[in-house]
Amino acid sequence: MTKKKVVIGMSGGVDSSVAAYLLKEQGYDVIGVTMQIWQEDKEYEEREGGCCSLSAVDDARRVAQKLDIPFYVLNFRDSFKRNVIDYFVDEYIQGRTPNPCIACNKYLKFDELLQKAKGIGADYVATGHYAKIEERDGRFQLIRSKDDRKDQTYALYNLTQEQLEHTLMPCGEFTKDKIREIAKEIGLDVHNKKDSEEICFIPDNNHGRYICEAAPNKVRTGNFVDKYGNVLGKHKGIVYYTIGQRKGLGLALGRPVFVTDINPVTNTVVVGPEEDIFKTDLVCKDINFISIDKLEDPMEVEAKIRYSAKPAKATISPMENGRVKVSFEDKQRAITKGQSVVFYKDDLVVGGGIIESLL
């Protein structure tokens, strides 16, 4: 019997490294691939660059050698720039706060990488994500990982049935601590490599400065205003702010104020008291459902409005033109346009969409 072939995306981190090992142990024919997506400066043009750093490629290659699996570096730079970086910059300029990891998963890892994998005769693509995929009643389900603290299903809600059928996520059955333990046991140097926290193409985490450099003619100073339109001061460009932000506003009003809205048309940033950033209802677009085909009637779920949020009780209701209304039982802090909202039923991911407006 021929072994099933799987292409695993390797970032040089501990999760994808151990995922590659686990798949090999499970009897798969494993091929390691690092997606070359980014270069910080000219040296990456001349040399073999990688996912934000040369060392990531080197780490991944060393792991592949240790596991004795073939390893390739694939160039995804143009696609990454088009689908992730340009999208990220445009969204901020429109006054929204996007999640680039979700775009990267949707367009690169589980679309283009999967197509490339199929092109070389592979049955599956695999990643080091903390999530589980199971077939139940003829439908592939995305299920929260065993490690609640590390669960990454929020960033994976766009997966289609076709993609789920051809995707493996072996880390979903383990806790992060156990994954590190396995890495140490099998002698991988990356066993104590720290988790990446920031956006991979903005290592200093300064989004505003990055967008200014990427689109200097699009970022203009403007006014801070209150909800009645009274001018309270000057801001340095709407891309520097996000809903709920309090620090770094440079306003001395004698009371704490928070960013409550961003208006790209008037180039204003609205600030107000903290209670103004608590809301219960939103509308989302670009919906993808996983556990169901489509939403016919209102459904009670738990929903997350950002990666780090706790799931909160909500009702989702179908609207016109494919949108979904989400009504939370309790007010949520700083619901942010451009972020994703993801729906859960127990451990199952029902689906999700991008927050378009607040009601």
Swiss-Prot record:
Catalyzes the 2-thiolation of uridine at the wobble position (U34) of tRNA, leading to the formation of s(2)U34. It catalyses: S-sulfanyl-L-cysteinyl-[protein] + uridine(34) in tRNA + AH2 + ATP = 2-thiouridine(34) in tRNA + L-cysteinyl-[protein] + A + AMP + diphosphate + H(+). This is tRNA-specific 2-thiouridylase MnmA. The lineage of its organism: Bacteria, Bacillati, Bacillota, Clostridia, Eubacteriales. GO terms for biological process: tRNA wobble position uridine thiolation. GO terms for molecular function: ATP binding; tRNA binding; tRNA-uridine 2-sulfurtransferase activity. The active site is at 104 (nucleophile), 200 (cysteine persulfide intermediate). The keyword Transport does not apply. NCBIfam families: PRK00143.1, trmU. Keywords: ATP-binding, Cytoplasm, Disulfide bond, Nucleotide-binding, RNA-binding, Transferase, tRNA processing, tRNA-binding. It is found in: Cytoplasm. Belongs to the MnmA/TRMU family. Pfam families: tRNA_Me_trans, tRNA_Me_trans_C, tRNA_Me_trans_M.
